[in-house]
């Protein structure tokens, strides 16, 4: 049953109906639509449209429908209703007859769908926050267990300075904490109710919209009806948070894909998150991580697509806004799935400490320590930098790490170098010296783990 048929003398072309109908995706708003309808029925009592008895009958029928939807959501897609609002209203009329036709008094699908979508977003943000914090906790736990796993840190994908696997884990904890903060900030702006704004100019019934917002769990009601029914910047904000969050997960995946290669060999992934080859029996492919990396693109696409949809729309509601849902649903589903999968990857990961240590020792990652040593002996840093560069060239020529060059060799580059240089060139010394806040020293890493544990609870 269409909600708008009185104006028309011809039925819609079936091809147009298929093009126009949105039930195939907005069915996901069924629970929110029913919850919003219960609240609206209460508001109609306050303005005399419904009696208390009528409202109770409607609420009971809506609650039965809600339980039915939760038990068998696929039933919605068996309908030829235009959208979820039409479906809910049709089912309600089936249950209570003519009384069901009174529920839409003073309400438009414009404020109705805006409310449904915000309620869905609030529910989904709660799920995302939980999954985000679970991944943070998994990273902190992995860091706790790998504080002594020394490995090379990289710039330009070249070995740069020694770090620990724990410090690497904590870098992603910081990124995820910012993602969490972005979601919490978005939730504050999302937490306002558009219900009662009608099609665009507000409702003609003197409904207490603040009370109505409270019944729905919103912090307050929106302040402008035109903005309320045409606002989708909360969708953009969540898509932006998802796009940034997926970039972080993509980088996390790329790092571990590299660490897992035969060339690096720093970690081994669990059989539970890898797959094999149909041809090559020896293969163990990091499919979970590659899919996380690959799915990043579709989330960026959803954000860009929504930006382009909204950029030229006049106030207030336009049918273009029907395009707000599929990209949003897919992007947030994808982000949620990837958060869960990243945590699963960490659950069975094995860090190969000897190989990590070997790689850290091979990459001349202690070259900066030698430069700092020379500075402490009074050599200007720029000169020290040049001296150490020459020493590294010689070490490479001989196929040795810096710390294995004899003192006589090192003194050819600078006479100020003494026996006291060798303890400074050890990997442990390199770590210990990075003791300022945020550094890789064991003390700072332990503090960072303790701080993260306390924050996550």
From Swiss-Prot:
It is an enzyme of class 4 (lyase). GO terms for biological process: arginine biosynthetic process via ornithine; L-arginine biosynthetic process. Its main location: cytoplasm. Pathway: Amino-acid biosynthesis; L-arginine biosynthesis; L-arginine from L-ornithine and carbamoyl phosphate: step 3/3. Its EC number is 4.3.2.1. It holds the Pfam family Lyase_1. It catalyses: 2-(N(omega)-L-arginino)succinate = fumarate + L-arginine. Belongs to the lyase 1 family. Argininosuccinate lyase subfamily. NCBIfam families: argH, PRK12308.1. This is Argininosuccinate lyase. It comes from Escherichia coli O157:H7.
